[in-house]
Every structure is written in C-alpha cells, then in structure tokens.
Amino acid sequence: MNGPLLRRHHPILLAVAFLLFARVSIADSNDLGCQQEPGDRFFWLERGFCDLPVHGPDRANGVVIWNHGISGTRQSWMAPAPPVLRLLQHRGWDVIMLKRHHSAETENTLYRTVQRTLEEVATFKKAGYRKIVLAGQSFGGYVTLEAVDSSPTIDAAIALSPGVRAQGATGRLDPSIIERILQRVTVGRLALVLPKDDALFGYQERGARAEAILSRRSLPYLLVDETSGISGHGGGVTGRFALQYGACLAEFLANTTLPTRRFQCQQTADPWPVVRELLLPPASDSLNLVRDSTALPESVRPLIGIRWGLLEDTIVLVAPVVAEQPGKLRLMYRSTGISGGVFDATTTGGVIRMVLPNKSTITLKPDRDGTLTWSAADGSRSLNTELRIGRED
C-alpha cells in the first residue's frame, strides 16, 4: 500500500490499531447480521440489507463495501445503507457495511478506516468476489477516495458528498483535498455525487472544478453535480437519488467496458421498476392486496391497488391489503425513509387515515390517482404528494 495517505504514518500505528481494536471480518466471523450493537469493537461488518438474499462470491457481480459518515459523538453507525445500494443488491451485488464505533473516533480515524477498508478488500478478493466497489457518504466518501488512492486495484468507487471539515463542526471544507485525489487517483471507474446546497460544506459548488479535473483524465466517470436536481449534503442517500440515478449507476457499474470519459445517464420514462425494486417486498412474500374494490368503503374505492409518490426526497408506497377481520381496513406502507409494514387504517369523510409507529399520520384522498399527506406527530409540519399507480408485474 503505497498511497500518499499511508506514507504519512509510521507502521507502528497499524500495530497499535490491531492491538486496541477487535477485528471482525468475513474471514473469521459469519455474523454479518443487521443492527448490531458495537460493544467493545471499533470496526464491525454488517450486511446492507438483511431482508434480501446474499448472492455470494460465485454468483454476485461483486461486493460493495460501504463506509458511513462521521458526526462527532453521534451514533453515525446506526444510519442504514442508502436506497441506491438496495437497488444494487437487487441487481446482483452484495452490499456490506463497514461500521465504526462513534465513541472511539479520534484524529487518526481516517487512517485506521482506510487501512481497515483495504484489509476487507483483500479479504473479499480472497473469498472469490470478482469485483470490489468502495462506496461512502461524506467522511465515508473521503475514506473511499483515500482508499482507492492508496490501492490502484479497486474496480470502482462511489463517493457521495465526499469530504470532512477541518477542526470538526466549526471548521470549513477544504475542497482542494478531494480535488488533489481526483487528479491522481487510479481506479477502474469513479462515480462522484456533489449535490447542490450542501449546507454542511458551506454551500460550496464543487461540480465544475471536479468536471474540469476528470475531463482531462483517461478514466470512466459518472458525475452527478449541482445541476442534477439532487440537493443537500445527504442528497445521495435519498430515495430521490435512487429513483433518478440508481438505474444509471447500476448500468455504469455493470457495463463490461466503458469509454474513458464522462458517462451519460439516460433518464427512463417509466420509474416504476426502480420503485418496485426499492419498496415492494421480496417476490416470495405474498402481498395479499385488496383486489375487489367492493371490499373498501365506497368513497375510497378509487384507491384500490398500489400507489407511490415522492415526499420531498423520500419515496413512499401504499396499498390496501386484506384484513383478517371483516369490516377492518389495513394499509401496506413502505418508504425509503423508515421501515414499513402493514397498519390499521380508518375511513372518515371520504379519506383514509393511518397512524405510523412514530405517531406521524398518513392521509389518503381519492383525488385523481390519489394524494397522500404526511403529518408530523406534533402537527408542526406536513408534506403532500400526488400519487402514481404502480403495478404488480
């Protein structure tokens, strides 16, 4: 490992890291279960999506190793893998999350995380995975770029809003750090997401400078910049990003050969296949949807079937399902923001209402193809979306 980051540190640091922090990897543990507690570990691995099947090294396109962000003493490791990676899992990739204990974050976290990421790269290669993709958000995106800068054998990198502020929350982003990596990094292909209005990084516009650098290099790259319709520091981890660019990213990674220039996304006229992959239960699960409209109160019968929409950056999906008790109404509700399920609902005044476990309220109205209103538990805000009709195919 001869990257510039690794050359700046004495080898003794690596030895200390091994002694101080327990290591759990695919080579010595089969426990990759989701929502683990860190215990006394600094690093541990989890599957990205425990409700989806693992492909394994023999059948998978490859493995995606995800690094999450950093936020002081907050439990950043609790953040789920982004929806766009769920789409990749559906399309033949195994997604693994490399998690870090927030209580052990130090000024040396970057170095240790890059080292551990590269160790996992070697482990998954030895396990037989044909391709290795590194991915990350914010600090995790920075780790991703430093890792591929330190090891030129990585097949692809996905960096979402990469960077870290100097001196913690009070500091500013130094964009030149990422730009220098872009000038020299050697990787099979690179996907870079730089959303508009990134408040965490001082609203700096980085897309034009990144394009100027990458366009001069012999490198296949996908750049989603400030002109893309994606906004906010976490824009790349939203349902909106998965909906608009997930299929494009999957194609970018799957193509056997790519020209050494910017990859252009072709927007699809039918977003439903992506919504279906993101939010419908696995095919083995019975949806048990209401198929006879007379099973619903007359005023809401137009709402029969699957419907979906966008609440700001979150994709939501709803459908009436068969209730075990006659006269009862139940709704399937799923979103890219929170885990979903099937919940009791009521009809009043020609609308359907449902209370989610977090006490927020969903209201469905049979206007046109349907409208959905989400209301906060304390009534402080609400969001509306016009619904579209989905399909079971």
Residue ranges of model-derived segments:
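C-terminal catalytic histidine-bearing segment of alpha/beta-hydrolase fold enzymes
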Residues: 217-282
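Conserved alpha/beta-hydrolase
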Residues: 88-104
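Alpha/beta-hydrolase active-site loop
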Residues: 107-127
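Short, surface-exposed "cap/lid" segments of acyl-processing enzymes
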Residues: 57-88
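The feature captures the conserved acid-bearing segment of alpha/beta-hydrolase catalytic domains
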Residues: 162-224
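Gly/Ala-rich beta-loop-alpha elbow adjacent to hydrolase catalytic centers
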Residues: 136-140, 144
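Central antiparallel beta-sheet cores of small beta-barrel/beta-sandwich binding domains
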Residues: 288-368, 374-382
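N-terminal cap/lid segment of alpha/beta-hydrolase-fold proteins
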Residues: 28-58
